Amino acid sequence: MRANDALQVLGLLFSLARGSEVGNSQAVCPGTLNGLSVTGDAENQYQTLYKLYERCEVVMGNLEIVLTGHNADLSFLQWIREVTGYVLVAMNEFSTLPLPNLRVVRGTQVYDGKFAIFVMLNYNTNSSHALRQLRLTQLTEILSGGVYIEKNDKLCHMDTIDWRDIVRDRDAEIVVKDNGRSCPPCHEVCKGRCWGPGSEDCQTLTKTICAPQCNGHCFGPNPNQCCHDECAGGCSGPQDTDCFACRHFNDSGACVPRCPQPLVYNKLTFQLEPNPHTKYQYGGVCVASCPHNFVVDQTSCVRACPPDKMEVDKNGLKMCEPCGGLCPKACEGTGSGSRFQTVDSSNIDGFVNCTKILGNLDFLITGLNGDPWHKIPALDPEKLNVFRTVREITGYLNIQSWPPHMHNFSVFSNLTTIGGRSLYNRGFSLLIMKNLNVTSLGFRSLKEISAGRIYISANRQLCYHHSLNWTKVLRGPTEERLDIKHNRPRRDCVAEGKVCDPLCSSGGCWGPGPGQCLSCRNYSRGGVCVTHCNFLNGEPREFAHEAECFSCHPECQPMEGTATCNGSGSDTCAQCAHFRDGPHCVSSCPHGVLGAKGPIYKYPDVQNECRPCHENCTQGCKGPELQDCLGQTLVLIGKTHLTMALTVIAGLVVIFMMLGGTFLYWRGRRIQNKRAMRRYLERGESIEPLDPSEKANKVLARIFKETELRKLKVLGSGVFGTVHKGVWIPEGESIKIPVCIKVIEDKSGRQSFQAVTDHMLAIGSLDHAHIVRLLGLCPGSSLQLVTQYLPLGSLLDHVRQHRGALGPQLLLNWGVQIAKGMYYLEEHGMVHRNLAARNVLLKSPSQVQVADFGVADLLPPDDKQLLYSEAKTPIKWMALESIHFGKYTHQSDVWSYGVTVWELMTFGAEPYAGLRLAEVPDLLEKGERLAQPQICTIDVYMVMVKCWMIDENIRPTFKELANEFTRMARDPPRYLVIKRESGPGIAPGPEPHGLTNKKLEEVELEPELDLDLDLEAEEDNLATTTLGSALSLPVGTLNRPRGSQSLLSPSSGYMPMNQGNLGESCQESAVSGSSERCPRPVSLHPMPRGCLASESSEGHVTGSEAELQEKVSMCRSRSRSRSPRPRGDSAYHSQRHSLLTPVTPLSPPGLEEEDVNGYVMPDTHLKGTPSSREGTLSSVGLSSVLGTEEEDEDEEYEYMNRRRRHSPPHPPRPSSLEELGYEYMDVGSDLSASLGSTQSCPLHPVPIMPTAGTTPDEDYEYMNRQRDGGGPGGDYAAMGACPASEQGYEEMRAFQGPGHQAPHVHYARLKTLRSLEATDSAFDNPDYWHSRLFPKANAQRT
């Protein structure tokens, strides 16, 4: 069985190595190491040989042919030219061994300890079948080992071979006996040396026929026909490239004694530096890189690192490096989740040489004293020393029992970190209790306890712990993390002298002596505190770095009275002990050290400085002149000045011709690559339909092969898979197209992506300027979706990094483009499910594209359900119906669109920052929403609020959103106000550039892949504009006044949807001309503003949110079954009619002034036509936000920017604020809420109260106010406010700092109708729904 397993492993290695090219395109295959052991019958053995050696040229190992039948066809062995190990032929019945091309047997492994060729017992005693010929006609070299050919009854001509001409080692044993006797003679042309009777079977002699001048092989008898010294097996000429085989290594066809070394000597820096042309030894071949299943050990390719080295990855190269002690070894711990509950005699040996414990370590009394119930004997205390190698414990350390004769825990003297990833009992990461004989802790190397509490109790003899400063060990806050009690009192310890060593600092110590200090008062050497380092005396001399003593380099000469060195390098010595080569002290001058152009030789002068030898010295020297060279004297060939001049001129001409040719070739390849890249990016494929009755669909995506895609690095990971940066290498092409590869896997394992589905074809057929087009897909066990690589990254990262360079025009244009992309997806029936700023990518600084759509529908239904335990579910971007019922529609995407726009307007703030995800659904049910961003007017904010309506049918469509943002993008400063901060006396600097030139070059050129991505801009007909104009702010943005801000920043908070006095406050401040804007709504709790870097951290469910799943399941169980109102019902149409009925007709589509990218430019509407604000989706009125009903049944949305309408006159303006019944923001008061009925209320104007000290120039209006003619000075139509008796929503007063309230205004107070109950936020409460939707006036309750 063991031999069979070995064959299977070698077969696997063969399949990996087969077909690889090394050296001169040699087909390399692995050998075997089974000896005379065989598995199965002769037929099975033959099949194994065939799989291993078909078309093989170089056998990396041993060629073993054992127990093969007489009718076996071994002609597949004829290609073998070299065997690195031995050749074993035994117990076979075939007549001829066809190895006519075998030239060299290296003998790196020998059979029976001494034979490179072993042939024995190749006959059948019951038949005439036997081995008769060894056709090794080309075998001319056995580098190591002897020959054994015995007991082959029918094998002939073996005694005619001159084995000394083949075997290099003269002392090698050669045994040839007891073989065939009745053999025909050799052919006369062979002169008695042959492998068979024919004239073609003569032995080729390459040594014994050579002239005496030849040291090895030759290709003729003349003295000038000697082979190169590096040849093996003969040659066809005198050069190292004429060898039949190489004695040592084959470097690109030339035989060399060693492969190019990884380090070469630099004459300028006097250092060994990495050789850019290094190669590694792979068998007898020099290769530029080892096969993927090998690692580099110094200069060789090996299958595994030796025991004292570990495998590391350096710049993508797997290498073996010394461990510097014990090599890292991770071991399983004890406790919860482990097979063992405690360390005991049954598992203690499993911790030998462990450096890292994955889990916990528990020391209980049942482990040390034994467990009779489980028949586990007592633990030998001496075996606890295996833990001296442990440096890290990822979980906790629990010591509740310890051997009586051990008075500390010094077996953990090398422990540096306790991770606390899993905690014991009440959250302890270090627990030491009831160890009656322990006097000190002894954790001398412990530097960090990452998490958890410390419990040290009931250790009657324990001292020294009183002195420890635990804040230096604990990470994070230390309050309430220490529970140390009932140990030996401090006064008793002091009385017995059990105090810290005087060399310890005030940080305390773990035990007695200078080696147990937490930190040192002066210096430390090897973890032991000392008074001073050996600066001026003592051995070895030292220098100090961060109060740590380090030894000087061994080549530094110890100095008296002054410092010997100032660092650890050989170039930091004050004086060298032996020689100095440049700035470095060395033990000897370089002698034959490999340099960039050959070996380097130097000699020491009288000052022991290393000086270079003459350039013609090839074996060293003793001086600078040519006559000082060691060895043979070289004859110099004089050259005239004319010859030198002609040589230089000819060289320059050749160089210029090569440069010109290279440039032309490079340009031609560049043009070809551009054309090929354009062809592949633009061209789609027609894929046959899955149903024969369907028509073939034009699918823009391709079906890739796995060999065409190459992943370079991981860009990120999300809910459905991992995104890689990679390249697409079309089959048969040499171009590399940069792409993004998203690997989608079904975690349940129930779905395979082997077949191409209709949904995959649907995704592949999508093509729009504002969605990331799918270039293709690669089916398989995991589905790979391939899109074009956009180096500018996500829109979320962009707005965070360049918030100081983003203007309102660009922000609104991005909103238009995202809406257009989502509208295109809606037209094609594609629900996104995960729209967020992180899933919007920048194709250019002015064009964005929606990405990551349609991925969820590729997985089975169970995997698309909302799982609160999933670590990356975007709860904060999801609509309520998606959170509670797993319902995803285009209108749930509208909700996510509103959150995405909010992210843009807050420059990448995290939604609901500071809130646990379990609180978000309840918060949304109560009617609270994200707060109004600081740069947004009420118009823009109301568009967001409409996207967050409870009833999905009331939310706008993406077409309406695109039209609305297009309208706003024509006058950006009117809707977005961005104020730049500048201090007094500081002139505002130039507007910062959004991107550096380097990043812009990355958009056009990917240097790593040698591609010009400027082609993408040409394909899309993008205008070549500078980045400064793309990111510039409109004129006047910097000087627009800003209102006062709330003390609690709303940019990262949320807003209750039922703030009754918000509109009134805003109206009053806007109408009165005050420079102070109305305070923004704030959250119930202060929330810190924050933003995280990855998709998995931005508002996604974490492991600590397990309670949310329970809440949702309870909410679902209580919810009533309701049929959602279809989009086509009367209420929906009436609302859409009110939103889309234009007052002034819009310009036809052909005249719409925007570019192909949806980038709308300001001030482009017709001069003679006033811009209409009612023809597109407008901002919702406060009464709509608050859940009240309008008087007019046909109009359920109130426009914030009203025109003069022919309507019945308003009621007379009240004479006082008390008559209005309004409730204003209570500055400085506590937050309160009220909830009333859902009766409709009429609109009343707001009285204008002038504020002292304000001027008309300070006034800034968000809305387009037109004269209404209603009352004195009233040129503004107030938004609807209800008296207290008619309000059907909550009112909230926001905190505001002192000084923001006009002193002369008196505010009326409203009494709340009833307090908010818990059932008001439940889905099964009809009052909740009717209080937050916008039904018609005659809507019936259900």
Curated annotation (Swiss-Prot):
Tissues and organs where the protein is expressed, per its UniProt entry: Epithelial tissues and brain.
Residues of the signal peptide: 1-19
Disulphide bonds in the chain: 29-56, 156-183, 186-194, 190-202, 210-218, 214-226, 227-235, 231-243, 246-255, 259-286, 290-301, 305-320, 323-327, 500-509, 504-517, 520-529, 533-549, 552-565, 556-573, 576-585, 589-610, 613-621, 617-629
Domain Protein kinase intervals: 709-966
Membrane spanning residue stretches: 644-664
Region Disordered, annotated ranges: 980-999, 1033-1152
Binding-site list for ATP: 715-723, 742, 788-790, 834-839
Effect of substituting residue 104 to M: In an ovarian mucinous carcinoma sample; somatic mutation
Alphabetical list of PROSITE patterns matching this protein: PROTEIN_KINASE_DOM (PS50011)
Residue positions where Phosphoserine is found in the record: 686, 982
Matches recorded under Gene3D superfamilies: cAMP-dependent protein kinase regulatory subunit, dimerization-anchoring domain, Hormone Receptor, Insulin-like Growth Factor Receptor 1, Chain A, domain 2, Phosphorylase Kinase, domain 1, Receptor L-domain, Transferase(Phosphotransferase) domain 1
Keywords assigned by UniProt, alphabetized: ATP-binding, Cell membrane, Disease variant, Disulfide bond, Glycoprotein, Kinase, Membrane, Nucleotide-binding, Phosphoprotein, Receptor, Secreted, Signal, Transferase, Transmembrane, Transmembrane helix, Tyrosine-protein kinase
UniProt xrefs under Pfam families: Furin-like, GF_recep_IV, PK_Tyr_Ser-Thr, Recep_L_domain
Molecular function per GO: ATP binding; ErbB-3 class receptor binding; growth factor binding; identical protein binding; neuregulin binding; neuregulin receptor activity; protein heterodimerization activity; protein kinase activity
GO biological processes: cell surface receptor protein tyrosine kinase signaling pathway; cranial nerve development; endocardial cushion development; epidermal growth factor receptor signaling pathway; ERBB2-ERBB3 signaling pathway; extrinsic apoptotic signaling pathway in absence of ligand; heart development; motor neuron apoptotic process
Residue intervals on the Cytoplasmic side: 665-1342
Outcome when changing residue 868 to E: Strongly reduced tyrosine phosphorylation
The enzyme's E.C. designation: 2.7.10.1
Extracellular-side segments: 20-643
Outcome of substituting residue 1337 to T: In FERLK; risk factor for erythroleukemia; results in increased ERBB-mediated signaling; results in a block of erythroid differentiation and increased cell proliferation
Example of a GO cellular component annotation carried by this entry: lateral plasma membrane
Effect the entry attributes to changing residue 742 to M: Strongly reduced autophosphorylation
Family: Belongs to the protein kinase superfamily. Tyr protein kinase family. EGF receptor subfamily.
Subunit structure: Monomer and homodimer. Heterodimer with each of the other ERBB receptors (Potential). Interacts with CSPG5. Interacts with GRB7. Interacts with MUC1. Interacts with MYOC. Interacts with isoform 2 of PA2G4. Found in a ternary complex with NRG1 and ITGAV:ITGB3 or ITGA6:ITGB4.
Function: Tyrosine-protein kinase that plays an essential role as cell surface receptor for neuregulins. Binds to neuregulin-1 (NRG1) and is activated by it; ligand-binding increases phosphorylation on tyrosine residues and promotes its association with the p85 subunit of phosphatidylinositol 3-kinase. May also be activated by CSPG5. Involved in the regulation of myeloid cell differentiation.
Descriptive protein name: Receptor tyrosine-protein kinase erbB-3
